[in-house]
Amino acid sequence: MLKVNNVFGSNPNRMTKLEDEHYFIDDIVSIKNRQKSKMYVREGKRIGHGSFGTVTQSILSSNSIEWLGPYAIKRVVKSPKVQSLELEILQNIRHPNLVTLEFFFESHCTTKDGGHLYQKNFVMEYIPQTLSSEIHEYFDNGSKMPTKHIKLYTFQILRALLTLHSMSICHGDLKPSNILIIPSSGIAKVCDFGSAQRLDDNTELKTYFCSRFYRAPELLLNSKDYTTQIDIWSLGCIIGEMIKGQPLFKGDSANSQLEEIAKLLGRFPKSSIKNSQELQDSLNDQKFKKFMHWFPSIEFFDVEFLLKVLTYDATERCDARQLMAHEFFDALRNETYFLPRGSSMPVHLPDLFNFSASEKRALGEYYNLIVPSLD
């Protein structure tokens, strides 16, 4: 069970604006030692915004002379009506494929009408590139993302999901813009946990969340009987987008989204179909041919991998462990280099198999199938 340390106290900081466009926070908390300190914050350009709030490139200083950073500060409005796991996750889970939280603080400011706005501020490592922008870098220039890059980013996303799912946490809004990447090294990190949920018996589950293009069929049907496998569906949509250069399914409503999905997967299956193995085999064969048509440039094992991810029945979707062991990732197990975009020199792959003790426990019997053989 994750726990949030109550380090803020009862009085959030009032951001004191100084003359040279930085402000002073007298109660900022370091994640490394959980100690409070006083720091100056200077915000630069805005690098993200949405219904959640804003993200700005920022630097910090204890004396307004020597500055640390850059960092990314995500500022969200604090609401008693909205319970978020974001701080719990960022504060308690340290993982190479999850964005790192460095500091955090609460603040408040006065609105134009004289009211008060209370905010949470997450000071995170600064990684300016997203998987979404990387996809556009390739396809806007008339090229395609290399297969090895697709597999490299996919494996790291799965590794992040393995950790979250082993704690019964679903991310809830997995999409290319929520995957930070460092193209020169091939590193990928999942970010934005504002929609994350803990799926246990004591949680009242919501049904309207996750960006529509990446929303699992069970969510589109307003089912409350869902699992962490909704993230696996979203991952399948992300893989398809890396292959094709645009979202796989682009509906403008829940119903039209299901219609778009049906163009690839066929109509949503009736329960009676499961009782006919012959019919099921026929449908699977048709689906495989349709996948080959939609993704003509990928190989047999890659199509088979997608079939294990993009399936209506959540119980038939492979989980993170099973997918990490798939032949789809053999190129990452058998080779040690990749060629970054725009580079003529190969570089070492990031360390993909440096699993922690908790990851090894979560992998269980799959561990030996995932790590490269010593032969």
From Swiss-Prot:
Recite the UniProt keywords alphabetically.
ATP-binding, Kinase, Nucleotide-binding, Phosphoprotein, Serine/threonine-protein kinase, Transcription, Transcription regulation, Transferase
Disulfide connectivity for this sequence is none
Provide any one GO MF term from the record: ATP binding
Give the transmembrane region(s): none
The EC code for this enzyme is 2.7.11.1
Q: Where does ATP bind?
A: I47, G48, H49, G50, S51, F52, G53, T54, V55, K74
Residue positions of the active site: D173 (proton acceptor)
Q: What class of enzyme is it?
A: transferase
The reactions it catalyses are: L-seryl-[protein] + ATP = O-phospho-L-seryl-[protein] + ADP + H(+); L-threonyl-[protein] + ATP = O-phospho-L-threonyl-[protein] + ADP + H(+)
Q: Per the record, what is one GO cellular component?
A: nucleus
What the entry lists under Pfam families is as follows: Pkinase
* GO aspect biological process, one term: proteolysis
List-wise, which residues carry Phosphoserine?
S211
Domain Protein kinase stretches: 41-329
Q: What does this protein do?
A: Required for heat stress-instigated phosphorylation of BCY1 which is involved in cell wall integrity signaling. Regulates activity of MSN2, a transcription factor that binds to the stress-response element (STRE). Probably promotes formation of a complex between MSN2 and DNA. Regulates the stability of ROG1.
| Family stated for the protein in its record | Belongs to the protein kinase superfamily. Ser/Thr protein kinase family.
**Protein name per UniProt:** Glycogen synthase kinase-3 homolog YGK3
| Organism whose genome encodes this protein | Saccharomyces cerevisiae (strain ATCC 204508 / S288c) (Baker's yeast)
